[in-house]
Amino acid sequence: FRDALPQISRIPAPKPGFKKYEDGRLRPDGKPGFNTLSGKLDFFSDRAAKFGYPGLPEYKPMTVLSKEFDLRLMNGSRKPYITHSKTRTDQPYLMEIEDCLHVNINPRDAEARGIKEGDTILITSPYGGPVEAKAVVSLIVPVGTIDAQYGWLDNQNTQKLMNRGNRDPLSGYPSYFENPVRIEKKA
């Protein structure tokens, strides 16, 4: 093995164990406690409050679905062989494994829309679309939800379905898991 990879080096793994907070394995300074300003579990963030954000998490209800957009899109699932569009489209072998966007849809939702495994579907949201994908009928997603990979381009790019105005105020992260959409079988 070392002959095949002469540049490889070993890095010792951290010692496994329980109660790492007791002996300083959670903090860069080696002191006992948690890796927070106080060294304790912080339920209220003084740092967030200092900058005018809520010190405690606030519940916000999800975007309400409508008759027209009656499914919720979870955008951002990943497959180990497709990380970003660059790694996929530059690799013919990866395109042989999966050559287009696949979207998981619950069997009940698929049946209600006349969609079968492998059908080409169009996804539209109040913010954009349509996005073209192949249907994967699966119990992996609950009723009322579809699940799409990210990283596809052009007419398969799910980013155009996102609500750009609905972001977490502290991190700026978009609401990738609650966008209302509708799907239909492509004619």
What do the PLM-derived regions correspond to, one by one?
Residues F1-I11, R88-N104, R108-A187:
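Long, contiguous, secondary-structure-rich segments that constitute the structural scaffold
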Residues F1-Q91:
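Long, low-complexity segments enriched in small/aliphatic residues
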